[in-house]
């Protein structure tokens, strides 16, 4: 079968769908020139494939090696329907490539009049200069030039030249396609791992920053007592299900090995510069999580969980809390598969009871509706996002577990919280597990909240 880039170029929707259905395939990977599948589908005008990729979570503002986004390519080639689709999904209309050109530069240069008009109608700047001092309207033929200037002026744009500055994109993050080879290695040679710095150590093991095949990674070395042939076999059997590359809000395990001399089971995952959601909210990272970013994180997590809940059987022993949600370099929240517990890791032990549903604290896992219990955990995450507080921070884990399970301890919603978030929190934290919504039901609610 041809590679995914060829299938997207040629518009082979059936082959693309089959490829996307394999959870080990990463739809945000790049080819040798940094083109993602979405770049190719937009360049070649493959609307059905573009729609499919966006629905599955392709990154809209991903940049190739020349810093072109999919919108640059769709605008250059005059694919008006795709331009409108990308704008609908919040494509950056004034994204700057390595030459300082925005999509409107290309629409004007190639005479894509209707696309140029659409871009201006949606806020594209007509006077922004590239590295060579040229504005988009300088590239347009006379009639289009006058029309665009007139439209821009009516929309309140200042028509004075906006000089090119290297700082146009500073403070924003440039999103590159991921290395497409990383998902090919499930078994990893421990000798190839370069351990750089220990990040953390707790009951379950050690966390290290490392390098592998030229990529920054996180290495998780598990602490397991009485390692045996049976535990080794269970580890090798359970790992492959954690290699989920097909959803942008799920962070896969890249691979695994057993570290000598005493075999320590070891997991490798992508390096996340911001760490976990817990780090971002409670440990003084450099940015503020305002209301709109909080809703964005909530939407990311809901999408990731909606996807995980489609898997049959469910991934067992996955606990949703702010330490098991990682924050990507472009501020995307991703559910970490490296935090899923293995069958041999302290069965029955709860290490983060503040996020656990009361019924899950009271009953055995097999007697609990996992999907409903996850929704309770999500409600606690919503509370954490809007209050910026650690739930029940003044109590020990033992006290939290007992009080939530037996004494009705619940997070209290402080005044001043958005009524929409407040209502959603209450719905998701219904005392009756059967009355809690499913994740695919709350995704559209969060999308509406984000649009506001």
Swiss-Prot record:
Residues 193-446 form the Protein kinase domain. The modification N-acetylmethionine is found at residue 1. Scaffold protein which mediates protein-protein interactions during a range of cellular events including focal adhesion assembly, cell adhesion and cell migration. Regulates integrin-mediated signal transduction by contributing to inside-out integrin activation. SUPFAM superfamilies: Ankyrin repeat (SSF48403), Protein kinase-like (PK-like) (SSF56112). Phosphorylation by PAK1 modulates ILK subcellular location by promoting its nuclear export. Component of the heterotrimeric IPP (ILK-PINCH-PARVIN) complex composed of ILK, LIMS1/PINCH and PARVA; the complex binds to F-actin via the C-terminal tail of LIMS1 and the N-terminal region of PARVA, promoting F-actin filament bundling. Formation of the IPP complex is dependent on protein kinase C and precedes integrin-mediated cell adhesion and spreading. ILK also interacts with LIMS2/PINCH2 and with PARVB and PARVG which may substitute for LIMS1 and PARVA in the IPP complex; PARVA and PARVB compete for the same binding site. This is Scaffold protein ILK. The gene is Ilk. The keyword Methyltransferase does not apply. Mg(2+) binds at residue 339. It comes from Rattus norvegicus (Rat). ATP binds at residues 200, 202-204, 270, 272, 279, 341. InterPro entries: Ankyrin_rpt, Ankyrin_rpt-contain_sf, Kinase-like_dom_sf, PK_ILK, Prot_kinase_dom, Ser-Thr/Tyr_kinase_cat_dom, Ser/Thr_Kinases-Pseudokinases. GO terms for molecular function: ATP binding; integrin binding; magnesium ion binding; protein domain specific binding; protein kinase activity; protein kinase binding; protein-containing complex binding; protein-macromolecule adaptor activity. It is a peripheral membrane protein. The kinase domain is likely to have lost catalytic activity but retains ATP-binding activity. ATP structurally stabilizes the kinase domain and promotes stability of binding to PARVA as well as focal adhesion stability. The PH-like region is not required for assembly of the IPP complex or for localization of ILK to focal adhesions. The modification N6-acetyllysine is found at residue 426. GO terms for cellular component: axon; cell cortex; cell-cell junction; centrosome; chromatin; costamere; cytoplasm; dendritic shaft. Residues 180-212 are annotated as: PH-like. Residues 33-139 are annotated as: Interaction with LIMS1. ANK repeats lie at residues 2-30, 31-63, 64-96, 97-129, 130-174. It is found in: Cell junction, Focal adhesion; Cell membrane; Cell projection, Lamellipodium; Cytoplasm, Myofibril, Sarcomere. GO terms for biological process: branching involved in ureteric bud morphogenesis; caveola assembly; cell differentiation; cell morphogenesis; cell population proliferation; cell projection organization; cell-matrix adhesion; establishment or maintenance of epithelial cell apical/basal polarity. Keywords: Acetylation, ANK repeat, ATP-binding, Cell junction, Cell membrane, Cell projection, Cytoplasm, Cytoskeleton, Magnesium, Membrane, Metal-binding, Nucleotide-binding, Nucleus, Phosphoprotein, Repeat. The lineage of its organism: Eukaryota, Metazoa, Chordata, Craniata, Vertebrata. The modification Phosphothreonine is found at residue 173.
């Amino acid at each position: 079968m041809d590679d995914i880039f060829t299938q997207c170029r040629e518009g082979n929707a059936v082959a693309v769908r089959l490829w996307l259905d394999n959870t080990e395939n990463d739809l945000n990977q790049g080819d040798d020139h940094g083109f993602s599948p979405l770049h190719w589908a937009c360049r070649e005008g493959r609307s059905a494939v573009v729609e499919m990729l966006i629905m599955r979570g392709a990154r809209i503002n991903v940049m190739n090696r020349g810093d072109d986004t999919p919108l640059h390519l769709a605008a250059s080639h005059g694919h008006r329907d795709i331009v409108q689709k990308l704008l609908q999904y919040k494509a950056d209309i004034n994204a700057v490539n390595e030459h300082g050109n925005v999509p409107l530069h290309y629409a004007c240069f190639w005479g894509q009049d209707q696309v140029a008009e659409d871009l201006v109608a949606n806020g594209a700047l007509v006077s922004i200069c590239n590295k060579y001092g040229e504005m988009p309207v300088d590239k347009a033929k006379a009639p289009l030039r006058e029309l665009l200037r007139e439209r821009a002026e009516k929309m309140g744009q200042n028509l004075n030249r906006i000089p090119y500055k290297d700082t146009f994109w500073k403070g924003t993050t440039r999103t590159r396609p991921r290395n497409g080879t990383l998902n090919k290695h499930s078994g990893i040679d421990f000798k190839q791992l370069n351990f750089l710095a220990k990040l953390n150590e707790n009951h379950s093991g050690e966390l290290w920053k490392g390098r592998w095949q030229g990529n920054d990674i996180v290495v998780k070395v598990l602490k397991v007592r009485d390692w045996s042939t049976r535990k080794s076999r269970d580890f090798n059997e359970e790992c492959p299900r954690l290699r989920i590359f097909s959803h942008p809000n799920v962070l896969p395990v890249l691979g695994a090995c057993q570290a000598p001399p005493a075999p320590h089971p070891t997991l490798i995952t992508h390096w996340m510069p911001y760490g976990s959601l817990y780090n971002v909210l409670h440990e003084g990272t450099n940015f503020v999580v305002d209301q709109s970013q909080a809703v964005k994180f909530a939407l990311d997590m809901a999408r990731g969980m909606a996807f995980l809940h489609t898997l049959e059987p469910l991934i067992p022993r996955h606990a949703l809390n702010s330490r098991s949600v990682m924050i990507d370099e472009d501020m995307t929240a991703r559910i970490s598969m490296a935090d899923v517990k293995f069958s041999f890791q302290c069965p029955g032990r709860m290490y983060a009871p503040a996020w656990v549903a009361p019924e899950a604290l009271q009953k055995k896992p097999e007697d609990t509706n996992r999907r409903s219990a996850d929704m309770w955990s999500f409600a606690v995450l919503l509370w954490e996002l809007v209050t910026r507080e650690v739930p029940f921070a003044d109590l020990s884990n033992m006290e939290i577990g007992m009080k939530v399970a037996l004494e009705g301890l619940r997070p209290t919603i402080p005044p001043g919280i958005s009524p929409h978030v407040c209502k959603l929190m209450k719905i998701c934290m219904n005392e009756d597990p059967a009355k809690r919504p499913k994740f695919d039901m709350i995704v559209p609610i969060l999308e509406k909240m984000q649009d506001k």
